[in-house]
C-alpha cells in the first residue's frame, strides 16, 4: 500500500469491479517467460503456500489472536478484486519506514480494505486465511450468515494470496464480502496468527469482543458468536439494524 506507494494516487478499475472498501501502483506486465519458467513459478508458489501453512498450523507461535479488550491493529491492504498493488500498510503514524509512509487508518479508497474504516461502521467479523486446502471454506460460511447480521461488517484477508487465484475463489463461492491481500504476510505477527483460519470479532470502534476462533467452526457456532457480538455491541450503546 503506502509501502511502497500511496493507493489513492494511481487507481485503475479492476477487471471484475470493486467492492466498497483495496492498495497502490501501476501494474507492469513482464515479457513472456519460457515454458519451464512458468512451471518453476508455479512450483515456487506451491512451496510458498506449503511453507505458510506449515508455519501457521503445525508451528503456531503460541498466540491465540488479539485478546479481548484490545483494539484491532490498524491495517490497510489491496482488495483482491481491485487492480492496486502493494504491501500491507500497518503504520500507526506517518513515515514509519517499512510499516508505511501513511498511517494505515488514513489509507482509504474504493480498492482498499481498511480495518479502521470497517470498525467505524459497526461490529466486525474478520477472517484471516491462507488460500489452500480447507482453510478458505470459512469464507462461504461467513457469506451465508452475513444476510442475517446486516449491521456486522464481514471481511477477509488472504495471507500471501495470489490475486488471480483469489478472484477465482471469490467467484466460485459467490462472495460479496470484501477480500484483501496481505502480500508479504505482515498480519501474521500483527494479529498473532496461530491457525488457519482465524476469525476475530470486534465491537464498533475496533475493541476485540471475544477470543478469536482458531479453526473453522460449525455454522451453529459461528452464528452463536455473531449473535453474541451483536448483543454485546448493543449493550455498549450500538444502534445498528436488527438482526
Regions found by a protein language model. Give the residues of each.
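Short active-site neighborhood of thiol/selenol oxidoreductases, capturing the structured segment around
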Residues: 89-142
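Extracytoplasmic
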Residues: 70-72, 120-125, 154, 194
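Structural microenvironment flanking redox-active thiols in thiol-disulfide oxidoreductases
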Residues: 122-173, 183-188, 239-243
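Flexible, glycine-rich phosphate/dinucleotide-binding loops
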Residues: 84, 134, 163, 208, ...
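Short, surface-exposed patches at the edges or C-terminal ends of soluble domains, predominantly
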Residues: 3, 50-62, 108, 141-148, ...
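Thiol/disulfide oxidoreductase modules built on the thioredoxin-like
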Residues: 121-122, 171-175, 183-233, 243
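N-terminal targeting signals for export/organelle localization
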Residues: 1-96, 239-241
Amino acid at each position: 500500500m503506502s509501502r511502497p506507494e500511496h493507493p489513492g494516487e494511481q487507481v485503475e478499475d479492476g477487471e471484475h469491479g470493486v467492492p466498497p472498501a483495496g492498495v497502490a501502483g501501476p501494474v507492469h506486465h513482464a515479457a513472456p517467460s519460457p515454458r519451464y519458467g512458468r512451471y518453476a513459478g508455479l512450483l515456487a508458489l506451491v512451496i510458498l503456500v506449503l511453507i505458510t501453512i506449515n508455519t501457521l498450523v503445525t508451528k503456531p507461535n503460541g498466540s491465540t489472536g488479539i485478546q479481548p479488550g484490545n483494539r484491532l491493529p490498524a491495517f490497510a491492504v489491496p482488495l483482491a478484486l481491485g487492480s492496486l498493488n502493494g504491501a500491507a500498510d500497518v503504520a500507526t503514524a506517518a513515515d514509519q519506514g517499512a510499516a508505511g509512509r501513511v498511517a494505515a487508518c488514513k489509507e482509504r479508497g474504493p480498492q482498499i480494505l481498511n480495518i479502521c474504516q470497517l470498525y467505524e461502521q459497526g461490529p466486525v467479523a474478520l477472517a484471516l486465511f491462507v488460500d489452500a486446502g480447507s482453510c478458505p471454506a470459512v469464507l462461504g460460511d461467513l457469506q451465508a450468515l452475513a444476510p442475517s447480521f446486516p449491521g456486522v461488517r464481514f471481511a477477509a484477508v488472504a495471507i500471501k494470496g495470489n490475486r488471480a487465484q483469489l478472484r477465482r475463489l471469490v467467484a466460485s463461492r459467490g462472495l460479496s464480502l470484501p477480500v484483501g491481500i496481505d502480500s508479504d504476510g505482515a498480519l501474521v505477527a500483527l494479529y498473532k496468527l496461530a491457525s488457519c483460519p482465524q476469525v476475530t470479532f470486534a465491537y464498533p470502534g475496533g475493541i476485540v469482543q471475544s477470543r478469536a476462533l482458531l479453526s473453522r467452526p460449525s455454522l451453529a457456532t459461528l452464528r452463536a458468536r455473531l449473535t453474541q457480538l451483536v448483543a454485546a455491541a448493543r449493550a455498549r450503546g450500538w444502534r445498528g439494524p436488527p438482526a
